[in-house]
Every structure is written in structure tokens, then in C-alpha cells.
């Protein structure tokens, strides 16, 4: 044994030192690490908002530093608003200029963004007054708004005397378009493989369960038409069914009589419960915008809205509200408003109130207005508050509200002439800024309408915190 070991050691010693070193290097050499890559992409998420101001002449005189605000709009995950100052923002200018600013209206810190403000030419010539950051290089980069309430804009946006004799003002109306580009950065990593996941098919599976009636354990009798269903499915979807079925034990197959619903409505209700979708007839139902009185209530979507309220199905309610919202018109809004109030459809009610306020004179002259006054007197004050732009209780109590409502509802040719006085009555002497009718139109995408000859380098632009 010793001689063998000695021989092996001798052989090792006889190896060439260079060969031995090369062999050791190969034995201990680590593989080189793989090369990876990543890409940082900085870009802007753009969105536009159009702000129409009706009643410019009434807006003048509200005071220096006081503004009219647009509705808020969302771009890049933040909310924004346009502030228009009819008498200017800077006391030193003595109301010689109008001011326009873009304000960060939601919580956020150090929001970096680009802006564009356009005062639209209403003559059709397309000579808009445009202040834009998008088409030129910024030496110091995008603007940074530090926190909620920070603003960017112009104290001297336009000389007021020139504005009032220009094509930017038409029919006592101004139109301002704003584009915001929020700066975002993200890492773009290459993905070598991807697997597509199809949309959920659970609705189709439960739908087959409803159609085949497999395992059904309850029967609904609706005006002589029978519907088989499954108590567990109904209970899982509706708290009303849950309390009715799961609190009762030891019962076999049951028959339930439904006396307050038509068969087609109950069928649409089950279709939603099992498939989480509106039945096709409900999606296309419409009162065609020309009806008054109760006809809007006769649509399948309207009746299904009542079923959603009865069985506490908020998602179904929103689906029906979305369908009915598309049918709002001057003639139908009063009835749809009453319907929304009856069935606790808050989103639809809000849209109806806003539409009625923006089209008040035309709505007052419709037969639907009489229907609203006769059948839903409790909605009177709510509509008046919306018209006045008040979020708080009206001062003066109900007597004042009824007095104003009487002035509105008597119709006739004098309604338009009485309009400014009535708004003042509603506000109880509040600031005249509330007497301006504001129409807001949201638009996704850039929505820009530039004229290169009117772009300016905006040396007077200001950033305020």
C-alpha cells in the first residue's frame, strides 16, 4: 500500500508545472455572469379638458382674486381643475387682465407635468391663443407642483378690453381648452415569453346551470310562468335572498309566488344573477327620448332597476342606470329623475339633476316638468340647489324655495327675462359668481387645436404653491 502511494506522488511531482497550473485554473474557474438589460422610459400621460363659461358678462365684477372653477378631471392618476379669474388674480393690474390657471386638485407631492392652455377662437378661423410646453424644449425641464392647491398659469392671460371685442368671446361665452401631460418613468424589461389568459367563463358555466335546471331546488311562479333556480346561487348574490333562504332550514323544494314583477323582468333578473350581465333586451331598451309621463318607466331597464333595488343588487343597479343615462333628454329627464329617486339610483339621479340644471329653460317647458312637479315635489329643492350650484342647505328655508319654484314653473315668454333675478333670489344675495352657467365637457386624449402662429414662449407663466 505504501509503495503505491509513493509512486502516485512521484508521478504528480514529475508533471510539468505549467500543465499543473492550467489544470488547476480550469478546475477553479467560475463561469462568467449572464448579461442582463433594462430600459428606463420617461414619457407623459396626456389628457385634455374643455371648459365652457356661459354668462361672461355676469361673471365680471366678482372681485380680484376670485375664480370660477371647472369640474375636476383626471390625468395621470391626479385630479386637476381650471381656474378662470374674470377680474384677474393680481391686484396690481386693477382688473385689466383675465387670469387662467391650472390647479392640482388632488393629493400629491412633487407632481411633474407639462401644460397647454388654449383660448378658442369661435369665429371658425382657427386662430386660437395657445400657450404650450409640448412643442418646445424646456431649459429647466417640466414644471413641478409641490402639493394639492399648487397652480401654474398666467396672471396676465389676456387683456380684458381686447378679449371683450375679440372672436374669443361669442354669445357671452368663452371656451378654454387645457391639456396636461403628467411625467412618469417606468422600467421596460424585455419579456421573452407570455401566456394569454382568456376572460373568465364562470358566467357561462353558471348560465348553463340556470338553463339546464340541474340541481335546482326552488321554483318561482311569476304570473303563471315558472322559473327554476338554486337557492345557494341566489343567496350568494343577493342579501335579500340570503336572509330568505339560508335562515330557513330543513325545507325541501319550495314554490314561491312573485306578484310584483313581470315574467320578462324576473327572467332578466335571473340572467344577471347567474351570468353577471344584462340580458340583451335590457341593454337595448330605450324610451327614445321623446316620451313624457310614465313611459320611461315602462322600459325593461327601468323595471329591472326596481328589481335591483328590491333585491339589493348594486352592480345591477349601476348597469341599468348606465342604460337609462343614454336616454336622457329634455322630455325624458324629469321622469327618469323621479325613477332614480324612487329606486335609490344615486349616480343616475346626479346626472339627471345636472342635465336638468344645464337645460333648465327647455326642461321647464316640457310636459315632463309638470309630471315631476305633480308626482315628486320632494325633488324641487334638490333641483334648485343644483341650479344654484349650492352644496349646502339653501338659506331662507322652504318658503323661499317654494317662491322661487313658483317663478320657474309658470313658464311663458318672460322666463328668460326673469332668469338673472331668479338666480339671485335662490342664492339669497350670494356672490354673483354663482349666477354663471358653466358647461363642462371632458375629453380623453390630447384634444389640442393649435395654431403655430399663436404659440408663445409664455415668459409670464407663473407657478404658485
From Swiss-Prot:
Keyword vocabulary terms for this entry = Cytoplasm, Ubl conjugation pathway
UniProt signal peptide: none
What induces this one? By drought.
Its main subcellular localisation, reduced to a broad class, is cytoplasm
Bias type Low complexity, positions: 442-458
Q: Where is this region: Disordered?
A: 12-40, 395-429, 441-465
Q: Which PROSITE patterns match?
A: BTB, MATH
Describe which pathway this protein belongs to, using the record's wording.
Answer: Protein modification; protein ubiquitination
Q: Which GO terms describe its cellular component?
A: cytosol
> Where in or outside the cell is it found?
Cytoplasm
Any one Gene Ontology biological process term? protein ubiquitination
Is the keyword Cell inner membrane assigned to this protein? no
The record's tissue-specificity note reads: Ubiquitous.
SMART domains (alphabetical): BTB (SM00225), MATH (SM00061)
Describe the location of the MATH domain by residue ranges.
46-180
Where does the BTB domain lie? 216-282
Q: Which Pfam families match?
A: BACK_BPM_SPOP, BTB, MATH_2
Functional description taken from the UniProt entry = May act as a substrate-specific adapter of an E3 ubiquitin-protein ligase complex (CUL3-RBX1-BTB) which mediates the ubiquitination and subsequent proteasomal degradation of target proteins.
Question: Domain comment, in the record's words?
Answer: The BTB/POZ domain mediates the interaction with some component of ubiquitin ligase complexes.
The record's annotation in PANTHER family points to: BTB/POZ AND MATH DOMAIN-CONTAINING PROTEIN 1, BTB_POZ AND MATH DOMAIN-CONTAINING PROTEIN 4
Q: Which family does it belong to?
A: Belongs to the Tdpoz family.
Outline the subunit composition.
Answer: Interacts with RAP2-4. Binds to MYB56 at the promoter of FLOWERING LOCUS T (FT).
What name goes with this protein? Answer: BTB/POZ and MATH domain-containing protein 4
| Species annotation | Arabidopsis thaliana (Mouse-ear cress)
Encoding gene, per UniProt annotation: BPM4
